[in-house]
């Protein structure tokens, strides 16, 4: 019998100074993902395709891809406890002025890793993504 692992849900909202289609591509295109995270990413932007990010630390599968407004992934890290099921990551992208409101719900995260992942999303995704778009002349963003 598999052991029960307590899980948590992480919710975050971020405003990014780029249109939803560009944010969507940055999150689903391996080349763009690697560019803004400055780490290796693999995979294709197709439903059912497997992907890796952060030099293989993150791995998963695209479950739903609705360009340019919704991304749903099965998602795990190499530090997931043995026997833990993949989490479910959902990102919704909504136009907000000339930018995008990104709404993330990351459910089924092992509770012991929730605080680290909550901060990790900010430090390793949202900040670099905002900086990457700013370097492309997109301006500043808010969290």
Regions found by a protein language model. Give the residues of each.
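Hydrophobic ligand-binding cavity/cleft-lining segments
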Residues: 1-42
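A conserved amphipathic terminal alpha-helix motif
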Residues: 5, 108-143
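Alpha-helical scaffold segments that form or flank carboxylate-/histidine-based iron centers
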Residues: 11, 18, 49-54, 116
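Generic anion/oxyanion-binding catalytic loop in active/binding sites
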Residues: 11-12, 22, 51, 106, ...
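Tryptophan-centric aromatic hotspots in well-structured domains and transmembrane helices
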Residues: 27, 74-75, 121, 126
